Amino acid sequence: MKRSELDIVLKELTEQIYNLLGDKLEKVVLYGSYARGDNTEESDVDVLVLTNMEPEENRKILWTLNKIFSRVGLEHDILLSMFLLDKKAFHARKPILPFYQNIEKDGVVVYAA
């Protein structure tokens, strides 16, 4: 997928996430191979959805967010992978987990409150 096509997908995805969460949406971050620019035809699109909600609230919206990701992915014939997390947990784990550090280092912010 070309970057211009990916930008369209990410814009549509972010709009739908924002419509669901409103001001509870903190950030949408593209990470992984598409963010680094080393994606292949088989690569999925990794997206972090960072909220300012409690973990219990995140669990309640997980199913709806999965539906949004699936629908947008099917419409554009691309596999979208979602990682949903609250910002407190992300910042608490970032100093000790390389995965979180890589998102911080390589991630491309698509939306920030």
Task: Please provide the spans of the model-predicted regions.
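Short beta-strand->loop micro-motif that forms the acidic, two-metal-ion catalytic signature
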Residues: 45-50
